[in-house]
């Protein structure tokens, strides 16, 4: 429980040959998709828009000027934990909409502000996402925070498809969850 890193490795396979890309762990960032949903649920809990155990019916969200956004398949009725286990995009979209103070209606306008984005980013940073790990390496990448503010991108942020994070940040995030919310400084 110290945050000590014992080894770092990154390999890329191309044409049946391995190449060392260990530095990508600190210097490259990626959209991480559904990995983010544990932190997204935490955003909902901390802002009192997710009630533990409350069920909703999975489906699609249709926002004005935005194509329908759905889970990968119809997942039926879901509570917060089942939505996380089955990776429901819809559940995260509904949480994000509630976070803006709106109630979902088909084809609604969804005005969002930088403050709505920051509600997610501030909680994500508590897990080490989008912030420096403070590891003792020069030029650590902290990922890219998208600067365009739109309802579509806001919903994408909630499912890990907008901002980018480094593999080292994801390691920090997973370790924070595994340590019951205690975030250790990586060293």
Task: Give names to the regions the model predicted.
Residues 1-28, 42-187:
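Beta-lactam-recognizing serine transpeptidase/beta-lactamase-like catalytic domain environment
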Residues 35, 39:
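Active-site His/Glu-centered metal-binding helix of metallohydrolases
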């Amino acid at each position: 429980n110290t945050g000590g890193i014992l080894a770092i490795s990154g390999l890329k396979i191309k044409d049946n040959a391995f190449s060392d890309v260990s530095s990508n762990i600190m210097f490259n960032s990626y959209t991480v998709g559904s990995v983010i949903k544990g932190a997204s649920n935490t955003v909902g809990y901390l802002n009192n828009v997710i009630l533990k155990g409350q069920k909703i019916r999975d489906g699609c969200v249709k926002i004005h000027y935005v194509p329908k956004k759905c889970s990968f398949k119809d997942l039926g009725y879901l509570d917060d934990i089942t939505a996380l286990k089955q990776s429901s995009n819809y559940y995260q979209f509904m949480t994000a909409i509630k976070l803006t103070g709106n109630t979902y209606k088909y084809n609604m306008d969804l005005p969002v502000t930088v403050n709505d984005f920051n509600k997610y980013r501030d909680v994500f940073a508590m897990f080490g996402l989008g912030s420096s790990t403070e590891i003792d390496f020069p030029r650590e990448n902290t990922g890219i925070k998208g600067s365009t503010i739109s309802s579509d991108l806001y919903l994408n942020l909630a499912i890990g498809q907008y901002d980018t994070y480094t593999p080292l940040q994801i390691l920090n995030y997973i370790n924070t969850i595994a340590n019951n919310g205690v975030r250790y400084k990586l060293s």
